[in-house]
């Protein structure tokens, strides 16, 4: 049996176990005129906080406008935690065949050559429907359903290494804002919901995935050049220190938890949009499933203007070309991608030395 068939069988089996049609208790909720069945609504999803699946659904409905701004209209893989945040999860790339007619799907082609029909959210009812499947956080691709080959978002993922103070993440985020601004782009920051910060940058959808990744790599290297003590663009963990700027999050088929995603942490932490004025003092632990709805109701969404701020990648791509003339060629890609012509040896330095 092929791995694709096995994955499909597993997904169908899980759908069967987790389907609202099972005799277990369910709750029917009305969302924008549509009926959504929530199976096992009292199932505990965050044991340390006593939060249930229904609490998770209600959270997403409370912040639906912001969550859909980040994830709506984009194909997305379903990261399903059928036993809650402390249980096992699996990525389901194929949209469930049993989905309602108002839940869209679009066919994607992956670097491996495989294809799959992935879910596209258009409204709050569809959002509630995928949360019922056990999706705690949302993982949309950086493209719109109408143009799957040209991303409209560059994603800056700041990932601190072990023991790195969060203040260094703040400093790198502010420097990233500076570099982006110098290259004609406006970044919108958010907590990652874990230990880092993400910066979303809307771009004109006219560059390919490799070009967007090249721009992200150029950005990462420039940040590292300006703050070498706390920032790194090095792919191999043994070469890293400080805050890693993960340029490969912009490679095709990579996804990042989107705005207002609840993360599978014990405290149900949320990847929360921020204003730049909040970044110097932000404390990620303050933003949880229990606290963010009130913040959203009071302050609105700091990312509300993002769709009006699409910029050009050309200046970052010009920077990339200058870096190449200085001897900085391509950097390693993730393991399952075909090796590029200019890519260095795809092996950690310590392994290369042994050969």
Language-model features: where?
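Short, conserved phosphate-binding/catalytic loop or strand-edge motifs used
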Residues: 191-201
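Long, well-ordered alpha-helical scaffolding segments within enzyme catalytic domains
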Residues: 59, 166-185, 212-227
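SsDNA-processing nucleotidyl-transfer enzymes
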Residues: 23-32, 62-155, 159-162, 170, ...
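C-terminal accessory nucleic-acid interaction domains of nucleic acid-metabolism proteins
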Residues: 18-50, 57, 68, 72-73, ...
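Catalytic palm subdomain of template-directed nucleic-acid polymerases
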Residues: 200-213
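Short beta-strand
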Residues: 78-81, 187-193, 233-237
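Short hydrophobic targeting helices and cationic amphipathic motifs
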Residues: 10-17
């Amino acid at each position: 049996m092929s791995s694709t068939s096995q994955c499909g069988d597993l997904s169908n089996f899980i759908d069967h176990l987790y389907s609202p049609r099972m005799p277990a208790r369910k709750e029917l909720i009305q969302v924008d005129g549509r009926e959504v069945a929530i199976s096992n609504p009292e199932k505990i999803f965050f044991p340390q906080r006593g939060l249930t699946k229904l609490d998770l659904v209600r959270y997403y409905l409370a912040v639906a406008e912001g969550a859909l701004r980040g994830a709506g209209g984009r194909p997305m893989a379903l990261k399903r935690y059928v036993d809650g945040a402390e249980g096992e999860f699996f990525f389901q790339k194929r949209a469930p065949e049993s989905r309602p007619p108002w839940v869209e799907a679009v066919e994607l082609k992956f670097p491996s050559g495989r294809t799959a029909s992935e879910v596209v959210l258009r409204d709050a009812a569809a959002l509630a429907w995928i949360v019922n499947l056990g999706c705690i956080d949302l993982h949309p691709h950086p493209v719109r359903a109408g143009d799957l080959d040209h991303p409209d978002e560059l994603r800056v993922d700041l990932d601190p290494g072990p023991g790195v103070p969060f203040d260094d993440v703040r400093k790198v985020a502010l420097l990233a804002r500076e570099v982006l601004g110098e290259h004609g782009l406006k970044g919108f920051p958010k907590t990652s919901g874990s230990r880092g910060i993400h910066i979303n940058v809307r771009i004109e959808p006219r560059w390919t995935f490799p070009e967007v990744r090249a721009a992200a790599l150029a950005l990462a290297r420039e940040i590292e050049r300006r703050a070498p003590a706390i920032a790194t663009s090095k792919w191999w963990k043994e070469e890293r220190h400080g805050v890693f700027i993960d340029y490969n999050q912009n490679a095709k088929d990579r996804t990042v938890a989107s705005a207002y995603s609840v993360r599978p942490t014990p405290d149900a932490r949320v990847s929360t949009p921020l204003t730049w004025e909040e970044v110097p003092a932000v404390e990620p632990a303050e933003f949880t499933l229990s606290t963010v709805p009130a913040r959203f109701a009071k302050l609105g969404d700091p990312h509300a203007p993002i769709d009006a701020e699409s910029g050009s990648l050309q200046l970052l791509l010009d920077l990339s070309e200058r870096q190449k003339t200085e001897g900085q060629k391509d950097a390693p890609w993730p393991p399952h991608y075909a090796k590029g012509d200019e890519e260095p040896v795809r092996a950690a330095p310590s392994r290369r030395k042994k050969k």
